[in-house]
């Protein structure tokens, strides 16, 4: 890998280290969600049904419970903080190379979003040095993310292995059996870099930066350059039979024409498809 490419990739990773978004909860919702009867109930799965258990996470829950005097906030943290581990994390060793491999469901959909999975496990990175198993699981998420990027850097969500009759198989784009959905969203490539950088800065573990990672970085940079659209319309096209305009792309799936000024075009967003662009250096 060329020195310039490595520097570019590392610089990009550093620039993606933004503070996670904080979502506001409407006052009207808070009383409904945290009714007096609700805070007496443990909504976590029984221990035998939890997908992954971390000693460090359980100890953190106990520490925070001691700090929070508000009973409702304590209940919310106790049930929400471990939810990703309890219900969405599927950890194993890769059958081919024996490395940690973690597939993270995005809630009730049995598929892994690159952006979502990076955000879902983000709060646990701070505890990685306190729990070897947790650290290994996080490395597995990163390993899986970069493998998926190498399957298709334009895809936003992937199946846990090939599924010939996937839910969005009829979308008019370059689908394959491992892809759950192929909406080109620039944050799908930013979040894995952000997670890998933060994990490395926290743990010092460089095992994740292997040949798969180098290939993924090359694919990411190639994709970004392609979507600058300096010459032509780029490689990505997408159409879906739908009654929602946000779920498909105009101009026969190629999107609105843009002036080639160095911006990276991104056809998708977290709320659906559109023709927005993200500023980036030329």
Where are these regions (language model features)?
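Bacterial N-terminal signal peptides that target proteins for export
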Residues: 1-10
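N-terminal signal peptide c-region/cleavage motif recognized by signal peptidases
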Residues: 18-19
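Low-complexity, Ser/Thr/Pro/Gly-enriched N-terminal "stalk/linker" regions
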Residues: 27-115
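Solvent-exposed loop and edge beta-strand segments that line ligand/cofactor-binding
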Residues: 41-52, 102-117, 135-138, 147, ...
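Well-ordered alpha-helical scaffold segments within catalytic/enzyme domains
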Residues: 56-69, 119-132, 191-206
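Long, well-ordered core segments of solenoidal/helical folds
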Residues: 80-95, 137-156, 214-233, 265-268
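The feature captures the catalytic groove of carbohydrate-active enzymes
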Residues: 107, 162-202, 208-209, 228-282
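Membrane helical hairpin/interfacial module
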Residues: 107-166, 170, 177-181, 203-214, ...
């Amino acid at each position: 890998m060329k020195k310039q490419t490595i520097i570019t990739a590392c610089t990009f990773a550093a620039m993606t280290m933004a503070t996670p978004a904080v979502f506001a909860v409407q006052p009207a919702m808070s009383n409904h969600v945290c009714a007096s009867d609700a805070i007496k109930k443990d909504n976590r799965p029984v221990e035998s049904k939890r997908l992954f258990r971390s000693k460090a996470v359980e100890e953190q829950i106990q520490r925070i419970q001691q700090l929070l005097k508000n009973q409702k906030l304590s209940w919310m943290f106790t049930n929400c903080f471990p939810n990703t581990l309890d219900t969405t994390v599927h950890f194993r060793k890769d059958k081919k190379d024996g490395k940690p491999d973690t597939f993270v469901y995005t809630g009730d959909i049995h598929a892994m979003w690159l952006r979502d999975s990076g955000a879902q496990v983000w709060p646990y990175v701070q505890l990685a040095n306190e729990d070897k198993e947790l650290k290994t699981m996080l490395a597995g998420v990163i390993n899986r993310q970069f493998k998926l990027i190498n399957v298709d850097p334009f895809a936003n969500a992937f199946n846990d292995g090939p599924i010939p009759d996937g839910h969005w198989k009829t979308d008019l784009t370059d689908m394959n059996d491992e892809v759950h959905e192929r909406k080109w969203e620039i944050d799908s490539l930013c979040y894995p870099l952000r997670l890998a950088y933060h994990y490395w800065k926290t743990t010092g573990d460089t095992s994740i930066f292997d040949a798969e990672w180098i290939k993924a970085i090359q694919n990411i940079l190639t994709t970004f350059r392609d979507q600058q659209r300096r010459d032509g319309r780029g490689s990505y096209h997408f159409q879906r039979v739908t009654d929602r305009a946000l779920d498909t792309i105009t101009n026969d799936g190629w999107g609105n024409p843009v002036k080639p000024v160095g911006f990276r075009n991104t056809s998708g967003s977290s709320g659906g498809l559109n023709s927005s662009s993200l500023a980036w250096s030329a």
